[in-house]
Amino acid sequence: MNLAGFVPLSLCDYPGRVAAVVFTQGCNFRCPWCHNGHLLPMASDPATRVDEARVMAVLSERCTRLGGVVVTGGEPTLQADLPRFLKRLKTLGLDVKLDTNGSHPDVLRRLLQERLVDYVAMDMKAPWDKYATLTGVACDVAAMQASLRLIVTSGVSHAFRTTRVDPLLSAQDYARLADQVPEGSLHTWQLFRPAYSQDPALRAAAALAGASQPHAPA
């Protein structure tokens, strides 16, 4: 596995669980608001690459005190070794939460069929017709829709996540986006953090919008 980060203890990334977090290198999207820009290239920096053996050693030592492991990115489903890695986690008795953009339903289907994931969080970037604009690449929207259906019908715990980027999406866009999430599925909204954006223009627009907000008198 091409790993680029490891957090041995997190209280906020796996709902209801004390978990470790593993970050994979590489993403096929170029969302301008991404706060993990260093994880976008498929090729990792040898100086910062995380050794899988070291990660497994730490998890083996702590597995009885952890409720699970979050595998995030980047985009984990780009990793050819992902099924093998998840099997290693499962042999430790650890539940697995997968964070994904949903672009590879074939991989997701295999992971679900082999019961290698216990929780799936899929990003919902935009209304379907705006996906290419918001992700910065040509998108196979049908693939994301297939992943959504797989997740909802799988029976595993799941959530859909949206980052509110007001300079890029309108209130009408958010309403249409919310309608894409099947009834009964959890849909969480995350705040855009402009300081970490990959797009200088987006950072500037967010700063300008913040400056124009009314402030209480001192």
Segments the model singles out, each with a brief description of its role:
Residues 56-68, 77-204:
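Conserved AdoMet/S-adenosylmethionine-binding subsite of the radical SAM
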Residues 214-218:
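Terminal, non-globular segments
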Residues 1-23, 32-44, 61-65:
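N-terminal [4Fe-4S]-dependent radical SAM core
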Residues 205-209:
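A structural motif corresponding to the C-terminal lobe/cap of the Radical SAM core domain
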Residues 41-56:
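Non-heme iron-sulfur electron-transfer modules
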Residues 27, 31-34, 89, 98:
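Hydrophobic packing within well-folded, soluble alpha/beta domains
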